[in-house]
Structure formats: structure tokens, C-alpha cells
From Swiss-Prot:
This is Myosin-2. Residues 1089-1568 are annotated as: Non alpha-helical, tail domain. It comes from Saccharomyces uvarum (strain ATCC 76518 / CBS 7001 / CLIB 283 / NBRC 10550 / MCYC 623 / NCYC 2669 / NRRL Y-11845). Pfam families: DIL (PF01843), Myosin_head (PF00063). Residues 1223-1498 form the Dilute domain. The gene is MYO2. Residues 443-523 are annotated as: Actin-binding.
Length: 1568
């Protein structure tokens, strides 16, 4: 062992059993090792030892496992398999609300003393169905599933042994195992939640639970529902592994509980259920009052159990009894017997000095005998007397008071025990009758038996219980050893024999010929046998070698004996052993009971006799088998002896062990965590004692002796490949195809590099086997390697950082030096440049001064010349401009007056013309009113009005054009004004220049200035004149606009007059329009040979058919027209419609058409066959896709054909034929949809949804027409009308039901198809590059991957298919939204349920991948207009967030709860506890895990306190798997504008085509 400083270990503790410690000092003093340990309670202890590797040294602490292993799911995977490690692992898991833990083949179940219904839901059953043990978390259902699959696959019977002390939860565990077998589905139907009702047999099997609990369970100090008997339930299966029945065997019912209960305990539940649940009349009949009035019920004190309603439990028991075939009358007889037992308990026996007396008139006695149907005198007699039978006579003697009390209690116990056995036998008769017995192929047995018991006072019951546990423990040890051996052999590894503690000496002590039981039976058969004499025989016979190794007598007293059991030594008190072992009733009482008038009691006693005879025959057969050479027994040896309780128990135990040994056994050890039954409280010492008692620690010891730790090659390589240089494994990892041999070579390299002692491990065929402690050693190496690697990386990073810092500083110094030198040189050069520059500046300045002087003189001369030339040129330009302006002004003045005159004249002329035209129009209007009925006149009027509108429009256009010209003229004038303004600005500039220059030449330029001012005044006057002219033109423009507006108003008035005229002639115009349409339709029909008309002709067929057919033809679909196909119309029969010519005489007349139609429609057999096989089953779905645009007729052609056929049937009054026809159609459509699968599911399903919707809309349209149109009643009697309404109404309901059914069938199939893809795509696939979650290695997946993979692209393709099919097939948007929303909710539920059950899967990288996958779904929803898509995926979205955020403080958890508001506390706790910490992450602190678990507990407590409110504490989301609401029922039906007679060319429907052909011919003739 290694006890370096910092080593974590365990140290013994009086109160806690073991406490965590850490080595803080390890030194050698005087040849001894001196250790100092710091305990978790801050105490420091010292340990001195000579050898740190001495395993037998009890003073040495035990090594503690690494944190990653401390809460492991399987105790055998612990590196250090020792007592404190096992205890701590169970405690850690329990604190995290995980009540199940594996210990090799054993499942340890720790009682939570709280309701954990979420662990046993149907969802949980389906989660474990078909899963191998170890795939999911430890669970009761994993054991049940393993047993079920082994039975099914290996054809071998199975046994599940459920053991534990009272209050550990055995009964509940056994009950849920039975529920699993009764509820689990076949593997191929686990895709959708189990919805099928359980069979009657399964219900009866489950019904045995409340019956057995009522008659065999009671409240004890340790348990409110303690089983006081052992039970072995065989669930029987046939060849198809279907449950066909069951058998129950019971062991050692605690009979003494009937007559005695310790304080705070109760009698069997059934008595209290009777008191609370029996009707008042029945209670009066049975003479029952209150539980406190009966001695057999009130000894314990409180008769109530908190939280249990005995009346409700009574009803459950009664229902269960009825279910297993016990009639109400028999139940009443049973209740009478139970009531009689209570009255027996109240019998008061009088005590005398030596004897006891009992009157036959004692009230309780009379009531008891009345209910039992027996003689009270004889019954009382044998309570106080006994009879001894000798060879020659019978001796009757009196009993003393104590003996009489024992006799009274004995008969009560005898009756109750017999009743219990009879109930079991009766249940077996029902559940395993001869027919069932013949079909039995295999069974799974569930053994619910008491665990090892030891109290301050241990009696006969504890002895039998511990004897049974000795036998079971022996079988368990042998089974564990056998499995270990089998695995070693299968893996072909070297192994040596493992020593284990064999408890055979203890079993021999109990059951040998001179063992405890034999001596007990011998003493019990003696009339004067007593506990004391039996004790002396035990001492004399057994307290010597070799039995004294397991048997001893106490130091003081002669009333006890001690047996060394496998768990611990137990001292048994001999008082009552003989009496309890005899457990017989006197012959007198037996005769009295046999004379009963209670038929049920008689049947009970007969069953008891039969069982005794069977037992005696079994014993005889065993004797003959064991002594085949002996002579036949003589008369002295044929004495019939009543079997003792001990012998019966021994025999039943032998049979049980024989059964178990012939089956494959599974073990569940139930642990009671505390004595106070407090929820989620853990008592270390109590649990430790149970672990020792139930053999878990012994199992671990056996495992430790061999190779307890087993790793697959894949797991080992993934964990420890870093222990070897990367050059050795990198080549293998980089291979495209990695073989298993490559992985094994990596395994060997790792082991060769790390483990020097080859005996510490063995390499098998599929696994590596390690000795105890090796995993911790490898973990330490791995941790050291990672620590060293981290240190190296940090060292390199720090070196790189400081080197970069040094280089930066060095570079900075060099730069500074360079800059300094440069600065000095530049400063020197700058000084020299300044000297040179000063000299140069002086020379330059002198030259500049001279040049400037000369330049100023030259400039003055040039400026003078320039001014003179400018003035001369300006005068010339002014003269030219004045001339041009004068010409322009004269032109404008000359044209203005004539133009104004012309415009005024034109305006007046237009006004006069308008008035004249209006008057003419008014006259014309009056003329039109009189001629309104003339079609030609109306056309002429319309034509003239159109011309008038055109004329007015042209006038308006000319006005607009003229307005535009005026606008352009205004723009020209504005340009001129702008030029004038520019000229003025130029003059102003010139003026300023003159003012600057005239200072030196003021006198010279005075005259020039005056001249310029005169010119300026003249220019300003011209500008004013131009502005006046512009204002005049703007005024004219406004007048023109006003004139245009008036003309527009006049035009509007004219249009209004025209509208009024059109309104007055609306009726005529409509008529003309309809006539035009009719003409156009007839012309089209003439050219194409086809016509349109209503679906049904209006002519009655009374004369045609020669009978009084009801006038069903009056159903007219006013808006629904039958139109033939357009460009794709196909020939419907040999008489092609195109060949029809209305003007020719060869067309068939109406009578002939109707007669042929009637004949075709009446022969429904041919029509049904053709429609069913040819149309409905032989349909072809049109291609639907992104770029395909389908017309409605291409989609709903089956519905349109059915509508035509149906309409014609109604027209001819063929109601019965239509009913049978439609029944066939409805059945066929539903069958077709039911058979859809694969790639046809989506398009074909949408196709039939569209067609059924079309049919339903037609029927609704027809029904509304019948109910709202009075014309439909014409020609019908009231009865005929009601019959017709009823027919269509029923048809509406049928199509509504069909739509609902096929929608549900289709959607469930979609869910099933989606389930195969969703989990793989959303949960497992890693679509986000660069963030591999790393649960599995890519190169190893090449070897081990064997499942079909799906990605998010497959999911999006799936949804795209639905979208495009629904869009192409004209499905309403609301339906599309409903379908996708339902599927998204389903994806959310199943993926979340898969995630929450995944082990070693949930990591932050997995959260990134999940978030990416879900985001792609969200984006798809937004792209396709589905705004609620995000809400449907909330659980997945929030799970992804949970995996990515911090979870290390209480504040983090509180924030997390706010983020993940859709997740329940139980779901949060489950996800956090399942979170897989990466190597570079810190583990989630245990305090945080406990904090989250406490939140769940508080939530559960609140839900339990709030009555009437259901609280969902389950971890699963229940997927919505139907029934679904039909979204079509929430939207309006489709409108019927046209029913198109389109039959695709590829359809072979001769009769149907002929019907449509004839209907079309009839339409043509009706139109003609």
C-alpha cells in the first residue's frame, strides 16, 4: 500500500462506521512507520505500524478511491473494494436520489421511504425494454428485463431473489417486477408508448398483490407494510413468451401475529380493512363494531397507519378477490371466518386454582360459533380440556388457564393459517388451471423472502428465517463463484481457485439427522416435550466437535443457544419453540370444525388435509428412494404423524432451493437506510450491518480474490492511451481502417509500460481483467502524466511568454539607441542647415525687395491698360444687349394681346359646347331610358359613351399639353430673369472695383461713373418690366389651370351620369352577360365536344324507370358544376365525347342514357370491385416536389370520380346501393392508409388526406343544400326527405370519422418513422465541426459501429417532404402547422427521454452539438412560417443550455433553474447528476449535487402536502402518441365551384369511365 502525504483513505469511526481521512505525515521512527491522519471532522489521529503492506493489520486505514469512482454505478468497478468504499458509494448515490446500485450480479435497492413513482412509470418500463444490463442506470427493471430476455432467448427458466430485512422494500420491489412483466412489450413494438390494455391473466397476476398484502402483511415497528411470510411467484409463459398464468408458493406465515402484536404494531391488514370498509349492514350481520373493541386488534395501540385509507384498501382487496375468481358469496363467507377469529380473541376464559372454565353461553364464543357454523358447547369444551389417545383408551383431562389460552389461540391461528393457504391454492387454481399447465414453456420466479434477522429476543420465526437465508446465501456464493469461473473460462485467462466462506457447516447443524430441526421435531412429538428438555438435548448433542464450530451455549442461563450464521452469531431464546413447531390443533377442535355448516370453512379444511397427505406421500417417496433395499414398513412404522411446522418449512425450502438451482438466478438486495423510516436519511452503521448480513460484502470479497475490475479494450484504450508516447499510438489512430488487433496492441503497449507485475492483470478475448487496486494505480499514473503534461505545457508557455517579453525589451532598447543617435546627428545637421538657410534667406530677401518694387510698377501700368480696354468692350456689349432686349420686348408685347383674345374665345367656345353637349346628353339619357330593353341600343349607347369619354380624355390631354407649353415658357422667362440678375450682380462687382480704383483717379473717372450709373438705372427698369411681364404670364397660367379643373369636374359629372345609367340598367347588363357566357359555353362545347352543367340533372326519372322513384334528383349543387378535363381529357369509352354533335341525329336520347346509367349503377358488385381494386388500391400519387406545380384535379381525381358516382346513385334513388358502395370505399381507404410504409408514407398519406377532405367537403355541401334550399323537398314525401337527410348526415359522420382515423394512423406512422431517425440525428450526431463530444473514438467506431446512422439533414429532409407534399397537394396551412407541431413535440419528448437516460454522455461539447442541431430545426420552422417551433423544442433547448453553463455554486444552480424553466426539479437533478466531467473540468461538488437533490425532495414534499393537485415528479416527458385532434375539423370545408370529370389515362376503369361518359352526354343534351 502507498500512504504518501496527501493520500486519501478511510479510518474506523464509532458513530459513522468509517470516516474520510487524509495522510498529513508519513515518517519512519525506530523502525516503525508513523502516520498522522487528518479526519473529515478535523480530528488528527496517529497510526504506528511495522509494515504498510500488511493487509491483516486492523490499525491501518483503508485506501480511498479516486473521486471519479466514488459514486460508481457498479461497486465492483471500484479500484479499492473495501467495506467503507462500498458504504460510501451507496451513500453518495442515495444522497443524489439514486436508490439502485449494482454490486456485480446483485442489485442493491435502498429504500427511499418516499414516493418515487416516477421510477416505475410505463415510460420507464419502455426505456428499459430491450436494453442490455449496463446500458442504462441501475434499476429494478434492468434486472427484470435481463431475466425476461434470457428466458426468451436462452429458453431457460429464471428466478429473481428479492431479499432484505423488514422495511427494506422487498414487497414493493417484487410488486414492480411483476408489473414489469405484465406491462413490457415485445422488442419490436417498443417504439411507441405502450397503450394496449393488459390481458385478463396479467391483471389477475397483479391482483394477487393486494390479496397477499391484505392477508399476509402487517404494520411493524420497522415497516408499515411488512410481509410476514415468504413468497415465490412463478410467472408462466408459453412458447410465444406471452404470460398465460402464475403459481404462488408461500413460506412460514407468521401465525403468532394473529394473536399477539407488540406495541405500535398491528395485526394483518385485512382485519382493519374490514372494520373500515364493510357496509354497516354487513358489519351488523357479522357483529363487528370497532377495531379497538377486539383483543386481537388493539394490543399494539394505534390501529391507524398514517397516509393509508383502510376503506379504500378494502375496496381494492375486494376487487382483486373478484378478479381472481372468488365470488361475492365466498368473500362473504371468508369475512365471516375473519370476524369469528376476532370474536374468538375476545372469549373470556375463567381462571380457577388449577383449571380453566368456559361457558357455552359466553357472548363472544356464541358469536364466533355462529359465524363459523359450529357447535358452541363442543368448541368451548376443547378449549378447556385435552384428550390423550393411547392404544387402549382415550384420556380427557382439564387444562389450566394458560394452557386454555394457548388452545384458544392455537385454533385461531390454525383457522387463519388454513384460510391463507386456501386462498393461495385457490389463486393457483385460477391462474394455473390444467389448460394453462399444458401450455407452460418457461417461467420467471420472483422470490420475496425475509432477510437475515437478529433482535434482542430471537425466537422460532427468526430461526426459520435465518435458516432460509443460510440456504440462499450458500446458493448465492456458489452462483457468484460459478459466474466468476465461467467468465474466466470464456475469456481464456489464467486463474486459480478462489476461497470463500462456505456456510455448509451451519446448514448441516440445522438440517442433519441429529441437527437442530430433527431434535426439535423429536421433542415436539413427545406429549411431555418441553423447551427446557429440548435445550438440554441440543447442548448434549451439538456442543461438541465438529458442530461446536457453529453452535455454542451462552455463558449464563440454560434458555438460549447460539448459532454462528454467515452474517453474525445469533442467540435464540428457546421459549415457545416446541409449541410453535407443533402448531397443531386438538383432535376435538378439528372434529368440531369439520362439522361446520360454513361451506368455505369445510373447503379450507379439506384443502389442508389434502396438503398433509401430499406431504406424507412425498416423504414416503423420499424414504423409498433413499432406502430402496429396506423391507416394507411394518405396522409399528406406519403411524401417521402430523407434520411439524419445522419439517414443513424444511421440505418447502428444499423444494424452493431445487427450483432455484434449476433456474438462472438474479439477486436484488433491499437495504433499509434508517430505523425511523425517515425519507432520504442514511444511517451508516445500520446499512453496514445489512451489507454484511445480505452477503454483498462477501460477494465483493470473492470478486476481490479474483479480478474484480474488467474493462473492454475500447474503454481501456480511450482512458489510458496517454500513458505511452504518442508516437506509438498516433500511427494506429491515423489509420483509415483500424482493426481490433491494432487496439489490442495498444493495450499491450500501455500495460507493458505501466504494470511491471504481470500477475496483476490478465488479457482476455474481449476484456482486460485487473486485480484490486490496479485501477487506482493506473488512475494515479494517468493523473500524474496529465499533471506532468500540464506542468510541461505551462513551463513551455511561460518560457515562450518570458522569451517574447525579453525579445520585446531588447528590441525596444535597440530602437531607443538608434533613435537617440539619429536625434544627435539630426540636431547637428539642423544647426548647419540653419546657418546656411540664414545666409540664403538674406540674399533671397534682398532680391525679393528689388523684384517687388519693379513688379508693382509693371502691375500699375498693366492695370490701367486693362481698365481702359474693359470699359470700351463693356460699352460695346451694353449696346448689343439693349438692342436685343428691345426686340424681345416688342415681340412679346405684340403677341400678348392677340393670344389673350384667342384663349378667351376658345374657353368660351368650350363652355358653350359643353353645355350644348350636356343638354344633348340629357335628352339622349331620356331616350335611353325608354329604349333600355334593347340590347343593340344599349350597345350603341355604351359605344357613344365610350366615344364621349375618349373625346373628353383627348381634350384633357390637349389642355395638359398646352399647360405644359405655358410652363416651359414660364421657365424661359425665369431664365431671362436669372440672366438679368446675374448681369446686375456683374454690374455691382464692377461698381465695387471702380470704387477701389477711383481713389487715385477720382477726378478722371467721375464722368465714367456717372455714365455707368445711368446704364444701371436703365437696366433696373428693364428688369422691373420683365418681372411685370412674368407676373402676367403666371396669372394666365393659373387661369388655364382653373379652366382645366372645371373641365375635369365636368368630365367627372359625365362619368357619374354614365355610372347611374349603368346602375339603372344593371339587370339588363347581367342578363346580357349571362347570355354571352352561355353562348360562349355552348360554342366551346361545340368545338370540344364537352359541356358543363350541374352534377345532377333536374328532370325526374319517374317515366324513364317506369316506377315511382323518389325525386332524389332535386339535389342540385348550384355552385358545383361538372366540367370535363381540359387539355388532358382522355377518352372515357368507345363513344368518344368528341364525336358528339348536338346538331346530328346519332346522339343517344335521355331515356337511353338514364336506362344505361341505372343499369351500371345498380350492379354494385362490378362497380365496387372496379373502384376498390382499380381506383383506391391501384392509385398512383402524383410527383410532389420543390419545382412541381400540381393542379387540383391531378390530386383529387379519386374524390371527384367518387362524387360523380355517388351523385348519380342519389339521383336514381339507389340509397341502399350507395350505402354499401360507400362502406366499401371507407373501409378500403382506411386499409390503404394503414398499409402505407417507407418512402410512400408521406406522399400517399397526404394524397389520401386531401381526397378524404374533398369528399367530406362535398357531403357537407350537399347536406347544407338539402337543409337550406326549399326546392329539394319538391317531389318528395316527408318520409323520403327525412330518409334522405338521415343518409347524408350519417355519411357526413362517416367521412368525418374516416378523416380522423386516417389522420391518426398516418401521424402515428410518421412518429414511428421519425423515431428511428430523430434520436440518432438530434441526440447522437455531431454536425458541428471541431467540437466532437468524445464519448466514442472515431477510429474505434469503425470496428464497433453496427447501427444505421442518421444526421440532421435526414430530419430536415423528412420535414421538407411533408412541407412540399402538403403544399403540392393543396393541403391547408393550418393542417401543415398542426402536423409539424405535433411531430416537433414528439421529437422533443423522445430525444429528451433518450438524453436523460444516457450514461457517460452528457458533456458541454454534447450541449454544443445538441444546441446546433436544435437550432437547425428552429431555423427550418422560421423559414417555413412556423412561429411556434421554438416552443415545441423547449426541453431540448434548455437541456443544451444546462450542459453548457456553470454548475459549481448554489448561485449557478439558481440561475440554471431560471433558465431551464420547462424542466422539473427531478429532471434538472437527473441531468446534473448524469453530467460527464471532462478531464480539464473540475468535478461538480458533492454539496451542489446534494443541494439539487434537496430541491427535488422539497418539491416532492410540497406535492404530497397539497391534496387534490397532481405533481409530475417524473423524469420523462410523455410523448403525445394519440389520439390526435383532426386539424381538418377546426377549419372550414372547401368550396365547390366545379367538379371536373377527369380520369387519368393509366386507370383501367371501364364501367366507371362509361358512367362518366354517359353523364357527360346527358349534360350535352341538357345544354342543347
Amino acid at each position: 500500500m502507498s500512504f504518501e502525504v496527501g493520500t486519501r483513505c478511510w479510518y474506523p469511526h464509532k458513530e459513522l462506521g468509517w470516516i474520510g481521512a487524509e495522510v498529513i505525515k508519513n515518517e519512519v521512527k525506530d523502525g516503525k512507520y508513523h502516520l498522522e491522519l487528518s479526519l473529515e471532522d478535523d480530528e488528527v489521529v496517529s497510526v504506528d505500524t511495522e509494515d504498510l503492506n500488511d493487509d491483516k493489520n486492523q490499525s491501518l486505514p483503508l485506501l480511498r478511491n479516486p473521486p471519479i469512482l466514488e459514486a460508481t454505478e457498479d461497486l465492483t468497478s471500484l479500484s479499492y473494494l473495501n467495506e467503507p468504499a462500498v458504504l460510501h458509494a451507496i451513500k453518495q448515490r442515495y444522497s443524489q436520489l439514486n436508490i439502485y446500485t449494482y454490486s456485480g450480479i446483485v442489485l442493491i435497492a435502498t429504500n427511499p421511504f418516499d414516493r418515487v413513482d416516477q421510477l416505475y412509470t410505463q415510460d420507464m418500463i419502455q426505456a428499459y425494454a430491450g436494453k442490455r444490463r449496463g446500458e442504462l442506470e441501475p434499476h429494478l427493471f434492468a434486472i427484470a428485463e435481463e431475466a425476461y430476455r434470457l428466458m426468451k432467448n436462452d429458453k431457460q427458466n429464471q428466478t429473481i431473489v428479492v431479499s432484505g430485512e423488514s422495511g427494506a422494500g422487498k414487497t414493493v420491489s417484487a410488486k414492480y417486477i411483476m408489473r414489469y412483466f405484465a406491462s413490457v412489450e415485445e422488442e419490436n413494438s417498443t417504439t411507441i408508448q405502450h397503450q394496449v390494455e393488459m390481458s385478463e391473466t396479467e391483471q389477475r397476476i397483479l391482483a394477487t398483490n393486494p390479496i397477499m398484502e391484505a392477508f399476509g402483511n402487517a404494520k411493524t415497528t420497522r415497516n408499515d407494510n411488512s410481509s410476514r411470510f415468504g413468497k415465490y411467484l412463478e410467472i408462466l409463459f408459453d412458447k410465444e413468451t406471452s404470460i398465460i398464468g402464475a403459481r404462488i408458493r408461500t413460506y412460514l406465515l407468521e401465525r403468532s401475529r394473529l394473536v399477539y402484536q407488540p406495541p405500535i404494531e398491528r395485526n394483518y391488514h385485512i382485519f382493519y380493512q374490514l372494520m373500515a370498509g364493510l357496509p354497516a349492514q354487513t358489519k351488523e350481520e357479522l357483529h363487528l363494531t370497532d377495531a379497538s373493541d377486539y383483543f386481537y386488534m388493539n394490543q399494539g395501540g394505534d390501529t391507524k397507519i398514517a397516509g393509508i385509507d383502510d376503506a379504500e384498501e378494502y375496496q381494492t382487496t375486494v376487487d382483486a378477490l373478484t378478479l381472481v375468481g372468488i365470488t361475492t358469496a365466498t368473500q362473504h363467507q371468508i369475512f365471516k371466518i375473519l370476524a369469528a377469529l376476532l370474536h374468538i380473541g375476545n372469549i373470556e376464559i375463567k381462571k380457577t386454582r388449577n383449571d380453566a372454565s368456559l361457558s357455552a353461553d359466553e357472548p363472544s364464543l356464541k358469536l364466533a360459533c355462529e359465524l363459523l357454523g359450529i357447535d358452541s358447547y363442543n368448541f368451548a369444551k376443547w378449549i378447556t380440556k385435552k384428550q390423550i389417545v393411547t392404544r387402549s383408551e382415550k384420556i380427557v383431562s382439564n387444562l389450566n388457564f394458560n394452557q386454555a389460552m394457548v388452545a384458544k389461540d392455537s385454533v385461531a391461528k390454525f383457522i387463519y393459517s388454513a384460510l391463507f393457504d386456501w386462498l393461495v391454492e385457490n389463486i393457483n387454481t385460477v391462474l394455473c388451471n390444467p389448460d394453462v399447465d399444458d401450455q407452460i414453456n418457461s417461467f420467471i420466479g420472483v422470490l420475496d423472502i425475509y432477510g437475515f434477522e437478529h433482535f434482542e429476543k430471537n425466537s422460532f420465526e427468526q430461526f426459520c428465517i435465518n435458516y432460509a437465508n443460510e440456504k440462499l446465501q450458500q446458493e448465492f456464493n456458489q452462483h457468484v463463484f460459478k459466474l466468476e469461473q465461467e467468465e474466466y473460462v470464456a475469456e481464456e485467462i489464467e486463474w486459480s481457485f478462489i476461497e470463500f466462506n462456505d456456510n455448509q457447516p451451519c446448514i448441516d447443524l440445522i438440517e442433519n439427522k441429529l441437527g437442530i430441526l430433527s431434535l426439535l421435531d423429536e421433542e415436539s412429538r413427545l406429549p411431555a416435550g418441553s423447551d427446557e428438555s429440548w435445550t438440554q438435548k441440543l447442548y448434549q448433542t451439538l456442543d461438541k466437535s465438529p458442530t461446536n464450530e457453529v453452535f455454542s451455549k451462552p455463558r449464563f442461563g440454560q434458555t438460549k443457544f447460539i448459532v454462528s450464521h454467515y452474517a453474525l452469531d445469533v442467540a435464540y431464546d428457546v421459549e415457545g419453540f416446541i409449541e410453535k413447531n407443533r402448531d397443531t390443533v386438538s383432535d376435538g377442535h378439528l372434529e368440531v370444525l369439520k362439522a361446520s355448516t360454513n361451506e368455505t370453512l369445510i373447503n379450507i379444511l379439506e384443502g389442508l388435509e389434502n396438503a398433509a397427505k401430499k406431504l406424507e406421500e412425498t416423504k414416503k417417496a423420499e424414504l423409498e428412494q433413499n432406502n430402496p433395499g429396506n423391507k416394507k414398513p411394518g405396522p409399528a412404522r406406519t403411524v401417521n404423524r402430523k407434520p411439524t411446522l419445522g419439517s414443513m418449512f424444511k421440505q418447502s425450502l428444499i423444494e424452493l432451493m431445487s427450483t432455484i438451482n434449476s433456474t438462472n438466478v438474479h439477486y436484488i438486495r433491499c437495504i433499509k437506510p434508517n430505523a425511523d423510516k425517515e425519507a432520504w436519511q442514511f444511517d451508516n452503521l445500520m446499512v453496514l450491518s445489512q451489507l454484511r448480513a445480505c452477503g454483498v460484502l462477501e460477494t465483493i470479497r470473492i470478486s476481490c480474490a479474483g479480478f474484480p475490475s474488467r474493462w473492454t479494450f475500447e474503454e481501456f484504450v480511450l482512458r489510458y492511451y496517454i500513458l505511452i508516447p504518442h508516437e506509438e499510438w498516433d500511427l494506429i489512430f491515423q489509420k483509415k481502417e483500424t482493426t481490433e488487433d491494432d487496439i489490442i496492441s495498444v493495450v499491450k503497449m500501455i500495460l507493458d509500460a505501466t504494470v511491471k507485475d504481470k500477475t496483476k492483470y490478465q488479457i482476455g478475448n474481449t476484456k482486460i481483467f485487473f486485480k484490486a487496486g490496479m485501477l487506482a494505480y493506473l488512475e494515479k499514473l494517468r493523473s500524474n502524466k496529465m499533471h506532468n503534461s500540464i506542468v510541461t505545457i505551462q513551463k513551455k508557455i511561460r518560457a515562450k511568454y518570458y522569451r517574447n517579453q525579453y525579445l520585446k525589451i531588447s528590441q525596444a532598447i535597440k530602437i531607443w539607441q538608434s533613435n537617440t543617435r539619429g536625434f544627435i546627428i539630426r540636431h547637428r545637421v539642423y544647426h548647419e542647415m540653419k546657418v546656411h538657410s540664414a545666409t540664403l534667406i538674406q540674399a533671397t530677401y534682398r532680391g525679393y525687395a528689388i523684384r517687388k518694387n519693379v513688379f508693382n510698377v509693371l502691375i500699375t501700368i498693366i492695370n490701367l491698360q486693362t481698365r481702359i480696354r474693359e470699359e470700351l468692350k463693356r460699352k460695346q456689349l451694353k449696346r448689343e444687349h439693349e438692342y436685343n432686349a428691345a426686340v424681345t420686348i416688342q415681340s412679346k408685347v405684340r403677341t400678348f394681346e392677340p393670344r389673350s383674345t384667342f384663349l378667351n374665345t376658345k374657353r368660351d367656345t368650350v363652355v358653350v359646347q359643353s353645355l350644348i353637349r350636356r343638354r344633348a346628353a340629357q335628352g339622349r339619357l331620356r331616350q335611353l331610358k325608354s329604349d333600355a330593353k334593347s340590347v343593340h341600343h344599349l350597345k350603341e349607347v355604351s359605344y357613344k359613351l365610350e366615344n364621349k369619354v375618349i373625346e373628353l380624355t383627348q381634350n384633357l390631354a390637349s389642355k395638359v399639353k398646352e399647360n405644359k407649353e405655358m410652363t416651359e415658357r414660364i421657365k424661359e422667362l425665369q431664365v431671362q430673369v436669372e440672366e438679368s440678375a446675374k448681369l446686375q450682380e456683374t454690374l455691382e462687382n464692377m461698381k465695387k472695383e471702380h470704387l477701389v480704383n477711383i481713389d487715385n483717379q477720382k477726378n478722371k473717372d467721375m464722368e465714367l461713373q456717372k455714365t455707368i450709373e445711368d446704364n444701371l438705372q436703365s437696366t433696373e427698369q428693364n428688369l422691373k418690366n420683365a418681372q411685370l411681364e412674368l407676373e402676367e404670364m403666371v396669372k394666365q397660367h393659373n387661369e388655364l389651370k382653373e379652366e382645366s379643373r372645371k373641365q375635369l369636374d365636368e368630365l367627372d359629372e359625365t362619368k357619374k351620369a354614365l355610372v347611374e345609367h349603368q346602375t339603372l340598367n344593371g339587370d339588363l347588363q347581367n342578363e346580357v352577360k349571362s347570355l354571352k357566357e352561355e353562348i360562349s359555353r355552348l360554342q366551346t362545347a361545340m368545338s370540344l365536344g364537352t359541356v358543363t352543367t350541374s352534377v345532377l340533372p333536374q328532370t325526374p326519372l319517374k317515366d324513364v324507370m317506369g316506377g315511382s322513384t323518389a325525386n332524389y334528383n332535386s339535389l342540385m349543387l348550384d355552385n358545383a358544376e361538372l366540367s370535363p378535363g381540359k387539355s388532358r381529357t382522355t377518352p372515357m369509352s368507345g363513344n368518344h365525347i368528341d364525336s358528339l354533335n348536338i346538331d346530328q341525329d346519332n346522339g343517344a336520347n335521355a331515356t337511353q342514357i338514364n336506362e344505361e346509367l341505372y343499369r351500371l349503377l345498380e350492379d354494385t358488385e362490378i362497380l365496387n370491385q372496379e373502384i376498390t381494386e382499380g381506383l383506391l388500391k391501384g392509385f398512383e400519387v402524383p410527383d410532389a416536389g420543390v419545382a412541381i406545380q400540381l393542379s387540383k384535379r391531378d390530386v383529387v381525381y379519386p374524390a371527384r370520380i367518387l362524387i360523380i358516382v355517388l351523385s348519380e346513385m342519389w339521383r336514381f334513388g339507389l340509397t341502399k346501393q350507395s350505402e354499401s358502395f360507400l362502406a366499401q370505399v371507407l373501409t378500403t381507404i382506411q386499409k390503404v392508409v394503414t398499409q402505407l410504409k417507407g418512402n410512400d408514407l408521406i406522399p400517399s398519406g397526404v394524397f389520401w388526406l386531401a381526397n378524404v377532405r374533398e369528399l367530406y367537403s362535398f357531403v357537407v355541401f350537399a347536406l347544407n343544400s338539402i337543409l337550406t334550399e326549399e326546392t329539394f323537398k319538391n317531389g318528395m314525401t316527408d318520409e323520403e326527405y327525412k330518409e334522405y337527410v338521415s343518409l347524408v348526415t350519417e355519411l357526413k359522420d362517416d367521412f368525418e370519422a374516416l378523416s380522423y382515423n386516417i389522420y391518426n394512423i398516418w401521424l402515428k406512422k410518421l412518429q414511428k418513422q421519425l423515431q428511428k431517425k430523430a434520436i440518432n440525428a438530434v441526440v447522437i450526431s455531431e454536425s458541428l465541426p471541431g467540437f466532437s463530444a468524445g464519448e466514442t473514438s472515431g477510429f474505434l467506431n469503425k470496428i464497433f459501429a453496427n447501427t444505421e446512422e442518421y444526421t440532421m439533414d435526414d430530419i430536415l429532409t423528412f420535414f421538407n417532404s411533408i412541407y412540399w407534399c402538403m403544399k403540392s397537394f393543396h393541403i391547408e396551412t393550418e393542417v401543415f402547422h398542426a402536423v409539424v407541431t405535433t411531430l416537433l413535440n414528439y421529437v422533443d419528448a423522445i430525444c429528451f427521454n433518450e438524453l436523460i437516460m444516457k450514461r457517460n454522455f452528457l458533456s458541454w461539447k454534447r450541449g454544443l452539438q445538441l444546441n446546433y442541431n436544435v437550432t437547425r430545426l428552429e431555423e427550418w420552422c422560421k423559414t417555413h412560417g412556423l412561429t411556434g417551433g421554438t416552443e415545441c423544442l423547449q426541453h431540448l433547448i434548455q437541456t443544451a443550455k444546462l450542459l453548457q453553463v456553470r454548475k459549481y455554486t448554489i448561485e449557478d444552480i439558481d440561475i440554471l433553474r431560471g433558465i431551464c424553466y420547462s424542466l422539473t426539479p427531478a429532471q434538472l437533478q437527473k441531468l446534473i447528476s448524469q453530467y460527464q466531467v471532462a478531464d480539464y473540468e473540475s468535478p461538480i461538488p458533492q454539496e451542489i449535487l446534494r443541494y439539487v437533490a434537496d430541491i427535488v425532495k422539497k418539491e416532492a414534499a410540497l406535492s404530497n402536502d397539497s391534496k387534490g393537485h397532481e405533481h409530475s415528479s417524473g423524469i420523462f416527458i410523455t410523448p403525445e402518441t394519440g389520439p390526435f385532434t383532426d386539424p381538418f375539423s377546426l377549419i372550414k370545408t372547401r368550396k365547390f365551384d366545379q367538379v371536373e370529370a377527369y380520369i387519368p389515362a393509366w386507370l383501367s376503369l371501364p364501367a366507371t369511365k362509361r358512367i362518366v361518359d354517359l353523364v357527360a352526354q346527358q349534360v350535352v343534351q341538357d345544354g342543347h
